[in-house]
Amino acid sequence: MKKGFSLPLWVAGAARSALKKLVGLSFENYELIKIPYEKKEIKIEIHSVGLLKNDSHALGITFAKSGLDLDITQNLEIWTIASLEKISFENSLQRVPINIIAGSGVGIKEDTSEICISNFAKEVLYENLLDIIPEGFNLKLEIIFPNGAFLAERTSNQSFGIVDGLSIIGTSAETYSSASPDQLEEAKNNLAKLIQNDFKGEVVFVIGENGLNLLKTHNVNLPIIKIGNWIGPLLVDAAIKKVKTVILFGYHGKLIKLAGGIFHTHNHLADGRIEILVYLAVQENVPFEIIVKLSKLDNIENALLFLEKFNQSTADKLFKRLSNTIEKRSFAYVNRYVKTDMEIASIIFDRKRKIRWAGIYGKKYISYFQ
């Protein structure tokens, strides 16, 4: 399996190189990036660095190597522009002397216009920049992805209220393919560690970075494991390990595949999401002319918007059926391989990161997420 590093490390590498240039330190074609709370450094290659605007700004450039051929950030060009601002009375109370700005191609939250960056990414930047900032100054750091706006069109960012570019939401240093068998083994090992000691029987399987970030804002007091696309085999592994309840938590665009019996959910292997929704609409007795229109839409997000515009009650009934079907099909899938009474609950959030729907079992646990 190819090994690579997440986007925050490459951003930090370019930023550290730019800041060092700005304060007169010599250029090297790599930066050793420290990982928060870990005793290791990772070597990040730097493409180039230079001074701008009468030497008042410095530009650092690198190209991300995620190690994943299908990853949207593989070979992503990253620019960081560093400049220093003398601390004045007005900003003397700023807790962290780093102002991170979303430049061209970097995603922002549509409702607040704030840069979309994970806490892990911020911590990596702080860990690797604070020791270089001269005393009495704040660092202004602008992050630019020259190709970010174009690449963002191939993601579901806009569904989550993220516009104008790619978000910086990595939550760990290393990357691995979510379709790789090695990823499955790592997830199994993580599950084994989670259910040791005082394990109460319930575990949350969260699908994707957006789901993980949302969970962190709700302070869910349950063991949590972020899983990739090997959802089915991990459910079976949980049953073998005598887990009592697995709570599937994710965005409807990913979880809907389980309702259609697709338990390895990488889009390059199988999709069928609109077809599954059409089948569920037939089961829910949605008017035929609406079903025909649904079948012609290009993604689940547009389908939900269309249904809500047609009739909010119908949309909610259909997505509740989706939640119940996810639970039923998942239970049937697991019992093909191991006889178990393990409970499988589904809880689904929408494009606005609002937790909206839950299956029969999911309703028992939804209060944990609110």
From Swiss-Prot:
Protein name per the record: Cobalt-precorrin-5B C(1)-methyltransferase
Family, similarity comment: Belongs to the CbiD family.
Gene3D superfamilies for this protein: CbiD-like
Keyword RNA-binding assigned: no
Entry's Gene Ontology molecular function annotations: cobalt-precorrin-5B C1-methyltransferase activity
UniProt pathway: Cofactor biosynthesis; adenosylcobalamin biosynthesis; cob(II)yrinate a,c-diamide from sirohydrochlorin (anaerobic route): step 6/10
Biological process according to GO: anaerobic cobalamin biosynthetic process; methylation
Keyword terms, alphabetized: Cobalamin biosynthesis, Methyltransferase, S-adenosyl-L-methionine, Transferase
EC nos: 2.1.1.195
Source species, domain of life: Bacteria
Recorded catalytic activity of this chain's protein: Co-precorrin-5B + S-adenosyl-L-methionine = Co-precorrin-6A + S-adenosyl-L-homocysteine
